[in-house]
From Swiss-Prot:
It holds the Pfam family RS4NT. This is Small ribosomal subunit protein eS4. Residues 42-104 form the S4 RNA-binding domain. GO terms for molecular function: RNA binding; rRNA binding; structural constituent of ribosome. The lineage of its organism: Eukaryota, Metazoa, Chordata, Craniata, Vertebrata. It is found in: Cytoplasm. Component of the small ribosomal subunit. The ribosome is a large ribonucleoprotein complex responsible for the synthesis of proteins in the cell. GO terms for cellular component: cytosolic small ribosomal subunit. InterPro entries: KOW, Rib_uL2_dom2, Ribosomal_eS4, Ribosomal_eS4_C, Ribosomal_eS4_central_region, Ribosomal_eS4_central_sf, Ribosomal_eS4_KOW, Ribosomal_eS4_N.
Amino acid sequence: MARGPKKHLKRVAAPKHWMLDKLTGVFAPRPSTGPHKLRECLPLIIFLRNRLKYALTGDEVKKICMQRFIKIDGKVRTDITYPAGFMDVISIEKTGEHFRLVYDTKGRFAVHRITSEEAKYKLCKVRKTWVGTKGIPHLVTHDARTIRYPDPLIKVNDTIQIDLETGKITDFIKFDTGNLCMVTGGANLGRIGVITNRERHPGSFDVVHVKDANGNNFATRLSNIFVIGKGNKPWISLPRGKGIRLTIAEERDKRLAAKQSSG
């Protein structure tokens, strides 16, 4: 019987959105334990080597990290398998580049570059609120931050804006109909739209109905909804495509149009 934590991850069993091919090796980097789940994170090594192509091998990634060039959410990270996840800000001081991990419409983490101004904050979904010892109110966010003394109006499923330097809450958005949201799980992963209504199902999962900018309607569980803006004004810059998923036919037409204009 195996004792203790698992230390390996086979390539075939790695999450599909990492986009690792089956034939280049047997193993994949197993993410360290951290603020995001294994199936919902992107290890630093995959981001630097496979996405940005700043290194060819894992050894080179280690050399980059060990020089303390890479910051995630304003903190230097030297662990190459550190699990970066949704909404994390990855900064590379040396090149002056900043990235925010957000999903594209195919449910993969997009390489989304942001300005140094935008890299100063991140949005977090409130997972849980409670009153601790001596009556101190706490809240826990989707990236495992515990914040004490929050605004009493902030409830579960709301989104808070955090200043990365101080770790303090600067603003918040209520979970409400008419607000812009991004889907962070399920079949509609990566789609962005405005919340139209919420079906309450006591004892089961609440269902949220969302309408995207093209007028398409879809529904998902409440746990998959991440509010990213008040009204239809997003608080973060959106990746290419603005979270609108095209049908296969629409994608084909778009590709052909691009081909004709270039050819």
